[in-house]
């Protein structure tokens, strides 16, 4: 399958996986739409894509705010054309502490990681239904497969994305609209570079983007990578609770996100 000439819109495009996806899809011949909060970074990325002969448009929005998210995505689509591929990539992460019990951070993660996906799809889905074709994708995480100490809010938000996309995929099966859930492992991005522990099978953002685009071309329903970490977490998901608790005891001492509020 070729993406040449198709319109692809990516949220959270100002850094990390979103930035790399935009460059990769532009190289594939897509007209690329960029949505994120940071205008300066979006302008830099748009300039880079245009320098290499690509077609690009961008708009700023806080993806956790419904009106902003829908308006920005539809504004970009109005300039580039009907959306063929929407990638809901925007996401945030923070530790879930118990002393104090940081409910505001959990709320923020659910607003961005879950509702941000819903709002993004809301902006593109009606147009796809009217045209009778399209592709919706969401970036989840391998962390969604197991509740991890210190990550309760993050892992729960990503698990919610998985279930939401699964149900939507079945609903849209007869509408000729593909739905893909992407679950990466550790990827070198601004969100993970603060981690104080060794990240197994760490990938660059460019490598992750290449793998994701390949999965989207194949219209994979769910794509988990790298396979080694995926296998480990899936085994942990079905392992006895007493064994998992023992395995995770050391992990519990070092939460994966910096202890700063979102």
Q: Residues of each region from the PLM?
A:
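Substrate-binding pocket helix/loop in short-chain dehydrogenase/reductase
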Residues: 97-110
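Conserved glycine-rich Rossmann-like NAD(P)H-binding loop of the short-chain dehydrogenase/reductase
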Residues: 30-45
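C-terminal helical subdomain
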Residues: 181, 197-232
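The beta1-alpha1 cofactor-binding region of Rossmann-like NAD(H)/NADP(H)-dependent oxidoreductases
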Residues: 39, 60-71, 103
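Residue(s) in the substrate-gating loop at a strand-loop-helix junction
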Residues: 141
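Conserved glycine-rich cofactor-binding loop
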Residues: 7, 14-15
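Active-site helix of classical SDR
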Residues: 121, 157
